[in-house]
Design a protein with these regions (language model features):
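Short helix-initiation/N-cap motifs at beta->coil->alpha
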Residues: 48-54, 126-140
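Conserved C-terminal helix/tail region of periplasmic/extracytoplasmic solute-binding proteins
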Residues: 37, 43, 215, 242-296
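Hinge/lid segment of periplasmic solute-binding proteins
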Residues: 1-33, 54, 80-83, 166-167
Length: 296
């Protein structure tokens, strides 16, 4: 899926299900190419290190342009930068260690959440607006970047079809070659194990998995196809093509966190307060509660 020779496996009630990946997305940030040019930045070559990234934000601030549009009123949007940064900073094997009790949330995410907390301090406008208002503000040219994934592109283009957008991986360290793009499945196809119409269902899946159908959906949703010859449904995504070609991809870190933990709510508080230690301690407490009632 998305450049890797495997399918995502979902275990339900002790039975295995193997969905086909139909469309994918990626996490990073969307940027306004016109504003890049206005301050003398090359929109075709976004920053590749954390220092370059923060320098870019300061360049916009110095020019009197809001560097970053937040949408923190909708807590789930704070999970996007966490996933973007953790893709580079936290190897996926560390989540197995967390589950085994061989590491802690503090050790796992300390640097990640500190960088996310810093990220929002670069905004010169109200970050506590909704996703709807935030994407509207961005579409109207009121900010240089919005730290959301590819899934937000259609919403922005719906508001302003003429805006020239770019999409980039959010660098998390000062080593350009170390950067990893957070990407994953957005839509998957399955067939019920006990369906009365297996042949008909398979025909539908086979139809939808044809390249023409995959590409058409990708075009409509600015999505990414799951084929080895990856197709990007929006030219804005071309800047992240090398990550797919070089298999520098990681899953969303919050996929490793049980849904019973309100990670978005805790992140929302962390971003607005800047108290990263409280967030890490809250997450550890909630993680321990889940593990205490989990039997395998």
């Amino acid at each position: 899926i998305l450049g890797r020779e495997k399918f995502m496996t979902i275990v339900t009630c002790g039975r295995l299900s193997f969905p086909f990946s139909f469309a994918g997305n990626a996490s990073g940030y969307i940027y306004n190419k016109a504003l890049f040019r206005k301050v003398g930045l090359d929109p075709e070559n976004p920053p590749t290190t954390w220092s370059e990234f923060t320098d870019m934000l300061n360049t916009f601030k110095d020019a009197g342009i809001n560097p970053l549009q937040g949408s923190v009123a909708d807590a789930w949007t704070t999970q996007a930068p966490l996933a973007s940064l953790a893709g580079t900073l936290v190897p996926e094997s560390k989540y197995t260690e967390l589950k085994q009790g061989n590491t802690t949330v503090q050790e796992l995410w300390k640097t990640t959440v500190e960088k996310e907390s810093e990220l929002f301090t670069y905004s010169t406008a109200d970050t506590g607006v909704t996703y709807q208002q935030g994407t509207q503000n961005f579409a109207q040219g009121k900010a240089a970047i919005i730290p959301l994934g590819t899934y937000a592109l259609p919403q922005i283009l719906l508001i302003n079809p003429d805006i020239e957008l770019g999409f980039a991986q959010m660098p998390a360290t000062d080593g350009a070659s170390e950067q990893i793009l957070t990407a994953g499945d957005d839509v998957m196809l399955t067939i019920g194990a006990n369906t009365k119409h297996p042949k008909e269902a398979m025909k539908l899946v086979e139809f939808l998995m044809q390249k023409d159908q995959l590409d058409a959906y990708a075009d409509a949703q600015s999505a990414i196809t799951p084929l080895k010859d990856t197709y990007f449904g929006n030219d804005a995504l071309e800047t992240v093509r090398p990550f797919f070609e070089e298999n520098r991809l990681a899953d969303f870190c919050d996929h490793y966190i049980p849904s019973s933990i309100n990670i978005g709510g805790y992140l929302q508080t962390m971003v607005t307060s800047g108290n990263t230690d409280r967030f890490l301690n809250q997450m550890q407490t909630e993680w321990d509660k889940v593990q205490a009632r989990t039997f395998e």
